[in-house]
């Protein structure tokens, strides 16, 4: 009996299957096409979902600084979708983070080919050239970007930085001016153009640019630079004023304390100078320049042991600081350590400071 039941069941299933096949065969061409299109849509949706999930995983790996994993996952996205410009772009960024600059440049180029509105891809290419110390290629890349997008102020600014670091101040001024023409309120471009003018000893133009930069926001380094231009121009009062503004904005700005102290020193206000140098050293006990400056005040006050202590530390921090060695030699002589003084003067001369040789000849031969 059980065998008959099984047979009937099997026959029923077989007939049911046959009946389904017969039913399918009765679909019209339009119905079959509709069915197939739905299946294709479902398959494509699954593919798109997988691409998105893989892209998200790659982005998460990038955010976690796991750049190797990020590159692998972006490659998987590209295999599934070779026209995905964003995947190429972010893969290029990950390669840049691993310092694989040549590979990054190629990948970023592909990102731009796929999306010619992605000017950031060109910008990052230029960054790769800069990081790889290929400054000429970086400049060409920035020029290409500015030709494609004349409103990209940061490209002009970064080009200026390259020229500034090479001490090509006229070219730097031209690039910074290009950035400022795009964005008249570009504080960094105004500041850095001012620094070019300061290096060229055109202090009026430097002051004008620094003043304009400070109007864009209270940033301590802007006031510090403005003060330095006033100091270079001989306007000590304005220099002290703006160094004080820098300190007011950032009370932990040790450089501004040291610089203001230098102006006080030049103005022979040694008590105020000493106070500022001490403040700078309290903020940074390894600030060699401030140590040397405080030693100069101590020396004038005939506090030679204090001066020597500061200069000892300064030389320890900067063994090739010829001026610190010269001054330590002078201080050692005042403390009757002639042999130590002569050694310092000789080394200062060996480092290129002619004054060291003068002291050595006059006191050691």
Question: Language-model features: where?
Answer:
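Bacterial Sec-dependent N-terminal signal peptides
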Residues: 1-25
